[in-house]
Structures are given as C-alpha cells and as structure tokens.
Amino acid sequence: MQALRTAASGMAAQQLNVEVISNNIANMNTVGFKRQRAEFQDLLYQTIERAGSQSSSDGNIVPTGVQVGGGVKAGSVYRITEQGTPTLTDSPLDLAIQGKGYMPILLPSGETAYTRAGNFSTNDQGQIVTEDGYLVQPGITIPQNATDITISKSGLVQVKLDGQPQPQTVGQIQLANFLNEGGLEAIGDNLFLETAASGAATLAAPGEPGFGMLLQHYTEASNVDAVSEITALITAQRAYEMNSKVISTADQMLQATSQLRS
C-alpha cells in the first residue's frame, strides 16, 4: 500500500527536522552559531488520470486530473545568517562582527577556514589564536611587554608598550565575504570551509563596502531563539505522530483486506 511508504517518508523527514532543531537548541550558547532550518520537497506523483485528457465515458476534457503524491524528501538544511546579539566581555581580544563577514583562520592542514566566533586569545608565542589554538589570519603577534591592546572597528590592532607613550601598530585583521554564505561547509569548532557553491572568498578590511565592522570586547551570541525552536520542535513532533498514525491506519486496512480475502 502506497500510504505506508508515504507515511514512512514523512516520519523520516520529521526525524531529520527534529535533529536539526535539537542541534540548534544544543548550540544556544555557542559563540557565533547560526541556527539552521530543514526544507522539504514532495516526491514523484502517480498519475491516475491526466489533467486535460478526455474522459473515457463521454469524451469531455478532464479539468483537474487525478494525481497521488508519493511522500516527502529532504531538500536542504540551510543556515539562517541573521546577526546574533553582541555580548560584552572583559577580554580585549574578543571580537564581534557587526554585519557581514568571516574571520580567516589557518588550520594545521594549511587550509584556510572561516569563523564568526571571535573569542580569541594568545598562544605561548603571543600569536592571536582561536580557542583550539588555530592562528587568525593574517598572523598577528602581541608583544609580551604590551600593557594595552586596542582593536579598531576597521580591524587595526595597536598595543601600548612599557616605556613608550605612543601605541604601536602590530597588525590588521581582515574579513572574508562570500557570494553564497549558504554554500559554506561547516566542519565544527565554529569553522567553515569555502566550497564551489559558496564561491571564492573576497578579503577586505572591516568597514569596507559590503563588509561588517569589528566590536572589541564583544562576542556575537548564537542567533537561536528558544521559543521559536521549542515551537518548531512541538510542530515536528506532532507531524511525526500523525505520520505514525497513518501507518497504523494503513496497516489496519491491510489486515481488514486480508481477512476479507480469506
């Protein structure tokens, strides 16, 4: 019976939906996290009577036809890139991007990844790194005798050194933009890789046209909204239960048919 396969596809779709929602909820407090949504598409249709064909009885044109759908499939899981709320911190190396852009990160493999999680620190050599020790690109080193660190909205990094009244420039933070942010590949650790779908990265200083600005002493909070996610979770759960009910009903119909035949 087609209803069994159709309902099974609905249950599989809602299972994926719940998995996406649960990942959003799990990352409510993850710096720079962007929530995701699952989108679905209908499957092929069985055409019993084609619209516009002639009826076999009197030759009239069939106005709508008869088509029965075969279920649902996952079309995509897309990322919602709206801005998260800037959260004040006490670290001078914490950065939030206000607007579009990603900060380039050098991976141990030599690849360049990209992130919006600006909760940075320094390693034992004074280089600015992520929580996992990956270098921010281009590389910037904070001198050991630095007494104050200032990062401007345009990404200029300056430090004050012992015995020197004037600040010294030690680097310039850049941002990367992509034609299709949805095409970036998430690899965990708040990092993304460029793909053929995202297009090549375009680099520029923060504040340039089309690029966001930096906020020092801030990090960007996750854009997950708890109320919206719980509402979506309840909706997905109800849809799953209804598809399960369809399977139960179809099974009862099959049993009744079998009993009639026997």
Curated annotation (Swiss-Prot):
Pfam families (alphabetical): Flg_bb_rod, Flg_bbr_C, LlgE_F_G_D1
Any one Gene Ontology cellular component term annotated for this protein: bacterial-type flagellum basal body, distal rod
Keyword Manganese: no
Coiled coil location: none
Lineage top rank: taxon: Bacteria
Alphabetical UniProt keywords: Bacterial flagellum
GO BP annotations listed: bacterial-type flagellum-dependent swarming motility
InterPro entries (alphabetical): Flag_bb_rod_N (IPR001444), Flagellar_basal_body_rod_CS (IPR019776), Flagellar_FlgE/F/G (IPR020013), Flg_bb/hook_C_dom (IPR010930), FlgE/F/G-like (IPR037925), FlgG_G_neg (IPR012834), LlgE_F_G-like_D1 (IPR053967)
Keyword Iron-sulfur: no
Subcellular location: Bacterial flagellum basal body
Predominant localisation class: other
Subunit structure: The basal body constitutes a major portion of the flagellar organelle and consists of four rings (L,P,S, and M) mounted on a central rod. The rod consists of about 26 subunits of FlgG in the distal portion, and FlgB, FlgC and FlgF are thought to build up the proximal portion of the rod with about 6 subunits each.
Family: Belongs to the flagella basal body rod proteins family.
Protein name: Flagellar basal-body rod protein FlgG
Upper classification of the organism: Bacteria, Pseudomonadati, Pseudomonadota, Alphaproteobacteria, Caulobacterales
Name of the encoding gene: flgG
